[in-house]
Amino acid sequence: MNLLFHTLLFCFFYLTCFIPNFIRLKIKCAAGYNFAFRYFRTSYLPRIIPRFTDAPLILAKDLSMAGNVQEKQLRWYNIALMSFITVWGFGNVVNNYANQGLVVVFSWVFIFALYFTPYALIVGQLGSTFKDGKGGVSTWIKHTMGPGLAYLAAWTYWVVHIPYLAQKPQAILIALGWAMKGDGSLIKEYSVVALQGLTLVLFIFFMWVASRGMKSLKIVGSVAGIAMFVMSLLYVAMAVTAPAITEVHIATTNITWETFIPHIDFTYITTISMLVFAVGGAEKISPYVNQTRNPGKEFPKGMLCLAVMVAVCAILGSLAMGMMFDSRNIPDDLMTNCQYYAFQKLGEYYNMGNTLMVIYAIANTLGQVAALVFSIDAPLKVLLGDADSKYIPASLCRTNASGTPVNGYFLTLVLVAILIMLPTLGIGDMNNLYKWLLNLNSVVMPLRYLWVFVAFIAVVRLAQKYKPEYVFIRNKPLAMTVGIWCFAFTAFACLTGIFPKMEAFTAEWTFQLALNVATPFVLVGLGLIFPLLARKANSK
């Protein structure tokens, strides 16, 4: 059983930590070894985003490097690997295991079979249909439903990052606490108002860093990338050699088939949004469907390979989590502190105390900083970089000498500051606040996936107009049914996800529910105001 335990851990962390980092370099080699060397030296190390906590947040920029690859040169395995580093991260396993325990194994199988696989192949058809479009989802909507809805899609893609930005400084603070104190007690020693105030200060500081332009971004990313890459290799090396050195007791005992069967009730249903949140992001790979050799066959093959890779990673990771943490007695702060607990346990296996955990906490702090800085800058520039003056006021697009959209940054600051401080009125401790923001992300982020399915339904409806190289389902009624199913399932997950995962009808539960309902409407609704402001400005 020790061998099984460490084999699972090794496979999981090898997939999530080492392979994605290596792939970033490997994909680029198609353009020549000289280019690969330059990329490794100047871009690869500076821009590795931590695999333990996030899916890559600047992948759009990474993938743009692949534009140097000659036309039709990408193969199915290139597509699969590029997509894998877009979609997957360690946090996907941690968060869903914390919600469901080992039952999540069944949930992963369901999600991959009936949602993620058709979702990935839908993305393939849309990318093939609009092969010359560079705006992703907004381009798809613009061609099928007009520029007005295309603007709203682009706005949705940006504004859903606001809860993410509000949570990132929390993660930095937690990582610093583990690095300095060796445990998670820092966030318990101060009031939630004081901690969130410090969180806001951290956000303002790193927004200033982001506003300094690409030089500061590269410095932060370089340090973070090297640190997390080293920790990834270290974990893999220690995990694979542990069976010969240590003895490990499995935390979850008496595992049977019944352990994996969910009890379908309202509590279980409210956790589906986190699963949907975990598997999103495949649409970022769509611009490369027509750079694939024989895209009608190889692109769907790559997407199916992606589904298998992610499924294996999710299931092995969940089993490994069950071996480290008792599925029947999940710690209340597992979402908040799981990464540090894992390295702490690894240190215990090797009689190293907290050394590994502290090293990881420091590396993760740098990684979280890089993720925050890039996420402040990149999505906003995507929204404003090709803005239509009919929908976005010119004043919002004004930039400084560094190319920073000043007013766009100010808008981001206002929204994030509200989302950081407002919850302190009704949420009493930092652990619950962290989990609330994470669950809010699982409600808000999938809203952008809805536009993918809207575009697919529109393309199916206009099938005579578009002739893509790759078609997911040629039977029109069946294709329409699949598109409607994916849209409805995503919407259902978002709606049920708004209910807090805690004792119902308490004061804090009611407060969290109110915020979960209001936040998506307010954030998306703000996008309806800017066309009015733009119209007023243009009339003058």
Roles of regions detected by a PLM:
Residues 21, 36-106, 110, 116-124, ...:
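Membrane-interface "cap" regions at the ends of multi-pass membrane proteins
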Residues 21, 72, 105-106, 189-194, ...:
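Helix-loop-helix junctions that connect adjacent transmembrane segments
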Residues 70-71, 399-402, 449-502, 511-512:
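C-terminal membrane-solvent junction of multi-pass transporters and transport-like membrane proteins
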Residues 71-79, 195-197, 293-296, 305-310, ...:
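Loop-to-transmembrane helix boundary motifs in multi-pass membrane proteins
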Residues 118-125, 129, 133-199, 208, ...:
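Hydrophobic transmembrane alpha-helices that form the core helical bundles
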Residues 138-141, 146, 302-373, 392-441:
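TM-loop-TM module centered on a large, flexible mid-protein loop between adjacent transmembrane helices
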Residues 142, 170-194, 231, 291-295, ...:
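Helix-loop-helix connectors at the membrane interface of multi-pass transporters/channels
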Residues 176, 196-249, 280, 303-308, ...:
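Membrane-interface loop-to-helix entry segments
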